[in-house]
């Protein structure tokens, strides 16, 4: 199915009146089968509000892509939640912990070399209690600078570095309160970095979604929602229950083992046997 590119002048009123649209939208979770549509440019699973970084994006998605409808949140019958990866990454973007490369590098190097904590600075690695707290919730994991860095590393291994960085850049742009001049420059930077035909870190993006982004850029300077659908598309690739999977990954387990080993050494007075 080919999708005609609609002018934002036609799209935006529909988005503004999304509340009316939402009331008239009746979708059964089990009734959606994306594969039945003739547009085979991309294969997507059944979508729901949990798959989106902002629930408002579901409205945009459904308006722009009616042949790939996503079920929206029903406050009367469903608990408000979204994918673990999106919860964590959103908090990471807000805390600006995405560039803590030094932290994650030190952790990775220490874990790989199995150097005992007695030989490491107390600031090199997180404490045992901090690592244990990561198990409790995605929010506590995201609240730790070490947890942020390590989870991002894990997610990049699960998907790709470019996709994770694109998602984070989009989120920072969306949340920014900077002047319109900066936002306009940032829009073009993201396009040039990830979406243009000659982008050095080009990510796979459906043509129709890219066309929407370009129309937004052309008609509205620095619009905060420019990349919403593109960001949502990339977010769909992140694994579900990623918090649980992270806690089962060697990246986390090796670090936990190392910290426990270091605690044991410290308790026995740094015996040589450690």
Swiss-Prot record:
| Segments forming domain RGS | 137-256
Gene Ontology biological process: negative regulation of signal transduction
Stored InterPro entries: RGS (IPR016137), RGS_sf (IPR036305), RGS_subdomain_2 (IPR044926)
> Which Pfam families does the UniProt record give?
RGS
Gene3D superfamilies, alphabetized? Regulator of G-protein Signalling 4, domain 2
Name the SMART domains on file. Answer: RGS
Alphabetized, the UniProt keywords read:
Signal transduction inhibitor
What PROSITE patterns does its record include?
RGS
Q: What is this protein called?
A: Regulator of G-protein signaling rgs-11
Q: Which organism is it from?
A: Caenorhabditis elegans
């Amino acid at each position: 199915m080919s999708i005609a590119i609609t002018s934002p002048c036609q799209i935006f009123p529909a988005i503004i009146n999304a509340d009316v649209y939402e009331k008239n939208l009746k979708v059964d979770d089990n009734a959606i089968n994306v594969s039945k549509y003739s547009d085979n440019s991309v294969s997507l699973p059944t979508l729901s509000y949990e798959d989106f970084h902002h629930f408002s994006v579901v409205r945009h998605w459904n308006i722009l892509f009616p042949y790939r409808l996503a079920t929206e949140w029903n406050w009367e019958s469903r608990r408000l939640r979204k994918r673990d990866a999106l919860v964590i990454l959103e908090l990471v973007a807000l805390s600006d912990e995405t560039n803590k490369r030094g932290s994650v590098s030190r952790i990775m190097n220490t874990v790989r070399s199995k150097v005992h904590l007695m030989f490491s600075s107390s600031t090199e690695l997180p404490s045992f209690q901090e690592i244990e707290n990561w198990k409790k919730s995605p929010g506590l994991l995201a609240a730790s600078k070490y947890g942020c860095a390590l989870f991002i590393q894990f997610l990049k291994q699960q998907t790709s570095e470019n996709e994770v960085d694109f998602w984070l850049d989009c989120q920072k742009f969306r949340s920014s309160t900077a002047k319109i001049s900066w936002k306009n420059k940032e829009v073009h930077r993201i396009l040039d970095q990830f979406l243009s035909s000659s982008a050095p870190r080009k990510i796979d993006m459906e043509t129709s979604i890219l066309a929407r982004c370009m129309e937004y850029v052309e008609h509205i300077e620095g619009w905060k929602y420019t990349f919403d659908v593109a960001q949502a598309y990339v977010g769909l690739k992140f694994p579900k229950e990623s918090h649980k999977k992270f806690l089962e990954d060697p990246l986390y387990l090796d670090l936990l083992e190392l910290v426990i080993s270091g605690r044991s050494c410290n308790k026995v007075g740094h015996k040589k046997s450690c």
